[in-house]
Structure formats: structure tokens, C-alpha cells
């Protein structure tokens, strides 16, 4: 596992964008795994600036990590809406090549299998962008998630619901279920890029990078990935003991 420590959040965005840019230039039709939430927003903004400056990402495909169950794609609180706003439109991607797990439907279990099939038909994910929750979750794979899990409907931990309540009018409006790519799905990406900023992520980064590989910290599974890179700022790296922040 490679560790890159930047001075601050802006440096994290630049370092992460360099990784994506190098991939896109080497493989213009790359398939990206797209994290949602606040962690990757700096990366997406930096990529948007590079696209405005001439970086061509029009042939890139994308698969989002997760979605809330019960929110329609045009709901401004949905991750489908977030992906359109922060990725598809500013990076000038083809909307037909950007996929988000369905949060509504008659049979979400079948839809999850179809999502896995779509990733396979695209040739797999070249680079999976990831954030990390304060409880160590990846995507919406909460603690106790099986390390070999696939895309599925899952329950949201109360900790995660509290963290995400800031995006909703009231805490009770946060959905209790989600659709998420599984840890096994994430591990099949050819490269994994984990982004973290701020002191609130220091404990989870320390566990993910230096703790035991365990379902109690889902992100720790990345220790087993053959090509994983963690890009974090000094605050998020503050509790690492094997590298200098």
C-alpha cells in the first residue's frame, strides 16, 4: 500500500487528480469507480479545472459506489444527483457511460446483480476512488460487512446516518438503507485510491493502514489490494506510526 501525505486538503486534491490524469492520458477510455460523499469533492473540482484547461475525459466511463434506497435519481439528496453535479457535467462525461446503483425499483436484489454485470461488461474498474468513514466504512460497507461482499442492499449504521444528516433537512429523513458496491467488488478494481482529509479521519486511517485486516474496519481490506494508494493530509495521517506526517 502506497501512502502519499500532502500538507492540506488542496494538496490532497492535486495529488489524487495527478493519479487520475495519468490514467486518463494513458487510457482515454478508462473506467473509474466514483466515490460519493464529501471526501472526493476536492478531487472532482481539481479534475474539472483540468478539463476546463484541456484534459479530455469524454471517453471515460464511471460506476458510482453507492446510493440511498428510496431516493429517486432527480432528488437533490441522491448520489445520482451528486454524481451528475460534481462528475458527469463538470468533467464532460457521456451521461450514458456514467452509472449509479438504483435506489428505487421493484427488485433491488436483481438490480444489484445487474450492476455487477454492467461493471464486468465494461471490462472492470481501472481506478476506484474511495473515501473513508469515521467508522472505517468504504462506500456504505459498514463495520461487520463481509470482506468478500458484492453489490447489495445494506443497512446504514446509525453513526453514518448521523454523519450524513447534514445533507438532509432533518435527521429522521436520512434513509436507513442503501445500495452499495461490496468490498469484494471494490477489491477487483485494478487500482484503489483512498482519499482522506481532516483530523476526524485520523483514527480510521490509522486502523485502515496499520491495524489488522478485519470486518470491524472495512477499509483495512485495502491492505490486501495489490495496487492501493492512500492520499491524505497531515491531519488525517497524524496517528500513523510507520510513516512520517
Map each language-model feature to its residues:
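ATP/nucleoside-binding phosphotransfer catalytic cores, i.e., glycine-rich phosphate-binding loops
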Residues: 181-184, 188-245
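Ligand-binding beta-strand-loop-alpha-helix segment within the catalytic cores
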Residues: 56-129
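Glycine-rich N-terminal segment of FAD-binding domains in flavoprotein oxidoreductases
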Residues: 26-51
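A short secondary-structure junction signal
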Residues: 110-112, 139-145, 149-151, 204-208, ...
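Class I SAM-dependent methyltransferase SAM-binding "motif I" and its flanking Rossmann-like core
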Residues: 135, 139-183
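A glycine- and small-aliphatic-rich helix-loop capping segment at beta-alpha/alpha-beta transitions
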Residues: 46-56, 81, 143-153
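N-terminal glycine-/serine-/threonine-rich phosphate-binding loop
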Residues: 1-32, 245
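Glycine-rich beta-strand-to-loop/alpha-helix junction loops that act as flexible
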Residues: 34-39, 130-134, 197
